[in-house]
Amino acid sequence: MAEFVRAQIFGTTFEITSRYSDLQPVGMGAFGLVCSARDQLTNQNVAVKKIMKPFSTPVLAKRTYRELKLLKHLKHENVISLSDIFISPLEDIYFVTELLGTDLHRLLTSRPLEKQFIQYFLYQIMRGLKYVHSAGVVHRDLKPSNILVNENCDLKICDFGLARIQDPQMTGYVSTRYYRAPEIMLTWQKYDVEVDIWSAGCIFAEMLEGKPLFPGKDHVNQFSIITELLGTPPDDVINTIASENTLRFVKSLPKRERQPLRNKFKNADDSAIDLLERMLVFDPKKRITATEALAHDYLSPYHDPTDEPVAEEKFDWSFNDADLPVDTWKIMMYSEILDYHNVEAGVTNMEEQFNGQ
């Protein structure tokens, strides 16, 4: 049985196994407090995220289960990976992942990025999205603070599938709105992986310009700012809006012409402008895909089709429509955690046997 140690962080009890030491607060992540720690087993620095009261409501339990399933399934160099998970005696859940020194939001607020860094960061974002989308997963809340970077400029996407985007009045970071695709904002009938391409386009523009591209004060203002640059959406796109109120609002807006992006991004090279124009398209079906973006001329310094893997299998979303009581989610979660540790133990045993021969 693991031995647990308690510490108070920002008035919150962190109850972690003795494997981890030197707890330091890093900040609030999605639905939990994040600390850095030293993993005594691997001698590496890690991030430990405490999920607050995961079994307090069915909604929270399901959200935690979804995050656990996604972290277990997604294995890619540009996606954050799970290195440990445990339930404390107080029944809080802790996810342990690799620790990267900073995130893109902090980098962008500290200094302008040089061209080669912008290219390399965008390449890694697209490489990660190609894999994630091939697994049938949509991030839904891509923004600079969800993109982690270390001192070697290695980039990893984190906080997957957590945003409750079905709720257009979603609370949380106000800046989340800046990166949100129009089909989510206008509550169109359905959305898919293309929403992440729009968000990545907004992030790309912010790296080029040094400030958010569409800093809307609210959803109406947000949409207005988008149309100032990209013009009024075409009629066939407007007619896909399911909500009558939203449709009436969009049709009442003055017609606007698309502005050349070159006028706004005067220092960007032509290939950067071309890629950005292909990402920021109103019609999701006409937006460039992650795979296509990787092959674009702008990313050619890093593009290697032999080293841009896809997922071996699709993520199983069958649980997502389930409306289950907390106790059932808890049993399912315990089962996933046991499975994770059995698989990890199996790998370790195999390695020990192999090395012992």
UniProtKB/Swiss-Prot annotation:
Q: Which keywords belong to this entry?
A: Activator, ATP-binding, Cytoplasm, Kinase, Nucleotide-binding, Nucleus, Phosphoprotein, Serine/threonine-protein kinase, Transcription, Transcription regulation, Transferase
Query: Could you identify this protein by its name?
Result: Mitogen-activated protein kinase HOG1
As for family, the record states:
Belongs to the protein kinase superfamily. Ser/Thr protein kinase family. MAP kinase subfamily. HOG1 sub-subfamily.
Chief subcellular location? cytoplasm
- What PROSITE patterns has UniProt attached to this entry? MAPK, PROTEIN_KINASE_ATP, PROTEIN_KINASE_DOM, PROTEIN_KINASE_ST
Task: Pinpoint the Protein kinase domain residues.
Answer: 20-299
Q: Which cofactor does it need?
A: Mg(2+)
Active site at D141
Q: Which residues bind ATP?
A: V26, G27, M28, G29, A30, F31, G32, L33, V34, K49
